[in-house]
């Protein structure tokens, strides 16, 4: 029996297979001695692709990772069929002819996704109403309220079109429902549509070329440490602030650190700047933010990256 690795602290970029839920994938990795584990951005069971698994201290950066994160998806939709989940996993609720739709219609509608838009949240989703996930209300046969959210689509293009199917690629903000894009396209074209395939190709700042297959990770637990990426690479746009050993000890006890421009490559002070504090040996110590305290510019700790 292979020796399980110690608790890791960093990110594992996983290529989630089609079938299991994100939670099931996390549970399998957890069996490799990883008691403290989470992820940034759920994928539906039918979807595959980049799933960012957070290990140890990296679980504390989840909110920042998801807030900063642009995502790229490759999806395929099929015209003429509508389901209750808006994808191929659900039960068919309606069918309609689609022979009036042309490839140019598809391209036009996909281009219309661009920009900031309000999209309807799928009735089968983890979004909550009065504390209950919508999917639980839907499965119980209860009426689900129509919820909308604002999303940003920065790129959208048709990759191929072989009606009734069309494959597209979108670059979007975190939290975008690709099922909703397919569903709304079908509604606008008057024939309905469902999502049949979905691959997340990129979840900022990692692409699928850096992702590890789940089966390989599980089969070789001894290689987990070499597959884990440091926290500093997860937030590439955050400056690195190296502090002294004395400051590190103080930070762990709630002390603030003076803002010194020379420590930040002469970056001028502004409130709300964020950085990753590093110990003298480059170990991540904390996520920090600039503030004015007692009329002085300082760094304060957003989240400590040490064991509590």
From Swiss-Prot:
GO process terms (BP): mRNA pseudouridine synthesis; tRNA pseudouridine synthesis
Catalytic residue positions: 44
Any keyword tRNA processing?
A: yes
Please provide the record's keywords in A-Z order: Isomerase, tRNA processing
Organism domain of life: Bacteria
UniProt catalytic activity: uridine(55) in tRNA = pseudouridine(55) in tRNA
Which EC class does it fall in?
Answer: isomerase
User: What GO MF annotations does this protein's record show?
Assistant: RNA binding; tRNA pseudouridine(55) synthase activity
What is the role of the protein in this entry?
A: Responsible for synthesis of pseudouridine from uracil-55 in the psi GC loop of transfer RNAs.
* Family the entry assigns: Belongs to the pseudouridine synthase TruB family. Type 1 subfamily.
Entries under PANTHER family matching the protein: PSEUDOURIDYLATE SYNTHASE TRUB1, TRNA-PSEUDOURIDINE SYNTHASE
Report the HAMAP family cross-referenced here: TruB_bact
Under which name does UniProt file this protein?
A: tRNA pseudouridine synthase B
């Amino acid at each position: 029996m292979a020796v399980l690795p110690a608790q890791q602290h960093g990110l594992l970029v996983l290529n989630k297979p089609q079938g299991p839920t994100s939670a099931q994938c996390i549970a399998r990795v957890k069996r490799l001695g990883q008691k403290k584990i989470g992820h940034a951005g759920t994928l539906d069971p039918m979807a595959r692709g980049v799933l960012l698994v957070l290990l140890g201290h990296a679980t504390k950066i989840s909110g920042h990772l998801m807030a900063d994160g642009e995502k790229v998806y490759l999806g395929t939709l099929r015209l003429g069929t509508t389901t209750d989940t808006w994808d191929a996993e659900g039960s068919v609720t309606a069918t309609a002819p689609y022979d009036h739709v042309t490839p140019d219609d598809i391209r036009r509608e996909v281009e219309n996704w661009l920009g900031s838009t309000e999209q309807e949240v799928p009735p089968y989703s983890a979004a909550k109403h009065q504390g209950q996930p919508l999917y639980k209300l839907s499965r119980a046969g209860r009426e689900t309220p129509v919820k909308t959210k604002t999303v940003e689509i920065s790129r959208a293009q048709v990759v191929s079109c072989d009606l009734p199917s069309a494959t597209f690629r979108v670059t979007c903000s975190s939290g975008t429902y690709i099922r909703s894009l397919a569903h709304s396209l079908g509604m606008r074209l008057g024939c309905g549509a469902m999502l049949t395939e979905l691959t997340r190709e990129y979840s900022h700042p990692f692409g699928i070329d850096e992702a590890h297959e789940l089966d390989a990770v599980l089969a070789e637990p001894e290689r987990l440490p070499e597959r884990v990426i440091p926290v500093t690479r997860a937030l590439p746009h955050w400056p690195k602030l190296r502090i002294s050993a004395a400051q590190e000890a103080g930070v762990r006890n709630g002390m603030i650190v003076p803002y010194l421009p020379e420590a930040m490559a002469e970056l001028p002070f502004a409130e709300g700047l964020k950085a990753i504090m590093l110990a003298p040996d480059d170990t991540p110590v904390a996520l920090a933010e600039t503030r004015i305290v007692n009329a002085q510019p300082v760094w304060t700790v957003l989240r400590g990256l040490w064991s509590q």
